[in-house]
Amino acid sequence: MVTKRTLLAACLLTVLIVLGAGVVLLGGCARKETVAVPVAVEEKKEDPGLHQAAEEKIAGYTRPEALISVYELNRRLEDSGTFIIDTRGRSFKVLQASYPFGHIPGAVPVLHSNYCHPAYPGRIAAPLQLQDFLGKCGAGAESNIVLYGNDGLQARLYWALKMYGFDNVKILDGGLDKWKEAGYDVATASSRRPPDTFEFDLADSKAEQTMAVFNDVAAAVGDSGCVIVDARRNDEYLYKHMPGSVNLSSEELFNQDKTFKTAPELKVLAEAKKITPDKKVIVYSNAGVRSSLVWFALSELLGYPEVKNYDGSLQEWIKLERETEKSLQTKPVTLQ
């Protein structure tokens, strides 16, 4: 009897070891990351009606290729060309508090500083620096890049890529929150890709059409053919803003679920602020981040022909001792 028990225990131990090894091997095959899969959680079935409604909304924008719904991304998740970037890393501390606690499977995390100019803190990186960084992250010339975030950095990186001539890029409508709401899995382990070759075709650079510099803004002040848009919160605008600017806060662009409002809703919102497509538009914030969201809405979603994002934004304007206007005495908490 003792011998039989001993043999039975040995067999059970062998089975457990084999199963454990199998789990480890399987975990190492999924996009080079180990994903924590919830146990005994019922899979949420996709609602075809929600998917269709999301696609119809996106189709209503001037450039529908600029956005992707969570439903469509889920279908493309295993495509080898899909390259997802998590832009929530405003700082290393923020990245540590967000990415390891849940991200879209396969998403590569980036820090804001990774695509900032080393000599001009907060300014966008030069094209050679940015392409080298993206290549090291694993993005290639044929990658289908999808960006998601929650504070405007997704739009800033989108703006930079488009400015330097790379068009195969989209923003995830609703970001990670919408992804979770749809019931899709999230990963917790870091995702890495082998380095690739990523190069901008600078012959297609749109820098002159998409980025405003100080002289552009100075010339626009007082010009009836131009409108300067402040993308910050209203309390920030009231405390201090560029002369003659109008306030269209980036927060006004979104629904409660953090998806963009429809094209007709955005159009009404912009025109109520006297922001019309017949004018040259320059958008600013504190450091060119939130202004990227308003640039994206006006340029990509509504198709305004002349919209520029002021990279230096209010930080540069004040540093150069240019005039500002104010009507609120209490200084608010400011963002980028």
Question: What do these predicted ranges mean?
Answer:
Residues E33, V37-G60, P64, I124-A212, ...:
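Thiolate-centered catalytic microenvironments shared by cysteine-dependent enzyme domains
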Residues G89-F92, S113-H117, N150-Q154, L176-K178, ...:
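Solvent-exposed loop/turn segments at secondary-structure junctions
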Residues L73, A107, L161, W179, ...:
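Terminal peptide-recognition signature
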Residues E55-E142, D216-D278:
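Positively charged, proline/Ser/Thr-rich regional signature most characteristic
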Residues M1-K4:
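N-terminal secretory signal peptides that target proteins for export/translocation
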Residues V268, D278, I282-L301, V307-L314, ...:
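C-terminal soluble interaction/assembly domains
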Residues C11-V24:
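Bacterial N-terminal signal peptides
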